[in-house]
Amino acid sequence: MKRIVLLLSPLVILLSPIIDAFQGVYIDPRSDAGYAVIACVAIIGLALGMIATFCYKRGAVGNVVTAGTLAVTLFLFGDLSYGVFWRLADHIGMEGAAALAFAGLVVLILILFKLMAAVPRMMAAFAVALLGSTVLDRGLITEASAEEPAPAVIYIVTDEMIGISGIDTRLPHGAEAKAALSRVFQKHGFRLHSKAFSRHILTQVSVPAALNMDYSYNFPGDRSHYAYPGEVTKFKVLSLFNLWHRQGLSVNVFQSAHLDFCKTEALVDCHTFASFDGSRFIQRQRTEGGPYRDVPPASASLADVKALVEGNRQSLAMAAVGFVASNLLETKETALQEWHPRSYDQLAFPYWLGQFQNMILDKGRGNAFFAHFLFPHSPSVYNKDCKPTNRWVERSYLTEVRGLAGQELDEARVKEYGFYFAQTLCLAKQLDKFFNAVLSDKRFQDATIVVHGDHGSRISAGRNVETMSPRDYVDNYSALYAVRKPGVATGTDYKLHSVQWLNASLFRGNVSEVAPTVVGSIQGKSDDPAVYAPITDPDHVAIMPMHDFDASH
């Protein structure tokens, strides 16, 4: 019996985080990618189990080998589940991480060797507990501790969500979308800043500026000075995270694989999702005659493997499994780069918002929860009832990208906004469900909740100053901003403010409405709200006034 336990325990222990990974990235384990990844892990687990079984109780050397194989199993589990190796490497370098990992393995081998008589029972109990915790719902922890933790903060970025006053009610679904969003936020006690706008048109600049409560003009082109040197999508300084830490809150980050908010100097609990199901996407393309219908099935399966690896991208072991699985599928990653769609985050949004909700309800007070969702970001893959549309067309920058002008531009804008507002109605439904679940829990009655867009819909002629008309400024920069906090009155605020300034006002308090100016081409300070606008010459930028607006007039 003990040998059977030793044979199967490594397999069960290593498969548990893989099962969790499949649940996390919304991929069917029965897909080609699923079979390839599971086969790799199963081979490793069974090989370790066979070695442990064969060597068990075959003298001191045999027991050392058994202890060694089980120690390797536990190390691989730790890396698959928590990214132990890369986390160490981030702090002490690759060589230091390798040395520490080796030392840890030696210590673990010695401990297991000393406890060899009890090892089979220990491994069996650990394997059963892991499998149970992976497959079964743990339930929700709702009992308050003796000392009440600090009120929670819930912070959601809805990528490409235009502001309330930026919604043109004359366009298809516009009036319905505006009413639905307003109704949801009013129902749940929010204050809506109807004329909020972002100072920046690009997410990688807008969101870190908001998280640093920075409403200045000190930004170098398409980059953020809060990013690591030479990086565009990894951010070192996010002062809101630091502020939440000082307030006694644990910071939890829920993000896509496109922008990384986890590498910040503040310690965070990181959840990175990659939710693209390549096989289903390719099947739809073939059925409907889409532009990617001729992509080989192996490339679609590779997309699933890539999603699994990115969803566990802190794991060295998962990266190795992904490499082997990709080779089993006989394809190359370069094939993926030619067609990888930007639609998978949008398709998985309802699922991921539900996962974010579960994490909030599970962890409770004493936590700050940050999430960045690419929704209602293009393309519009859902209708107003959150049913898939099987539509994959990008809608941004109709002149600069699609070459449209005149009547063609106007007609395309009306059409694209119809799809966009339909997806916005889906967003309103999902947010309503989310708020119903979270706010019905008494632990979150005094939570601070912020929901904002990072820029406008970008259904415009383009982003460059030379291309933009007055309405394009609204399309590109108007951004949703809603806040629910004790002491903040419910209702609608029609003052013109940037989301970056609103964050500074909300979290820092007593901030000047005059933006600090550091850019050399701008002298002094400006009392007028303004936006950071690219121009055709990539070496120069423009600071343009953001005039009062109401898109329905």
UniProtKB/Swiss-Prot annotation:
The chain crosses the membrane at residues 4-24, 34-54, 65-85, 99-119, 122-142, 149-169. SUPFAM superfamilies: Alkaline phosphatase-like (SSF53649). This is Nodulation protein NoeB. It comes from Rhizobium meliloti (strain 1021). Keywords: Cell membrane, Membrane, Nodulation, Plasmid, Transmembrane, Transmembrane helix. It comes from the Bacteria. The keyword Protein biosynthesis does not apply. Its main location: membrane. It is found in: Cell membrane. GO terms for cellular component: plasma membrane. Coiled coil: none annotated. Not known; does not seem to participate in nod factor synthesis but required for nodulation on some specific Medicago species such as M.littoralis. The keyword Transmembrane helix applies. It is a multi-pass membrane protein. It holds the Pfam family Sulfatase.
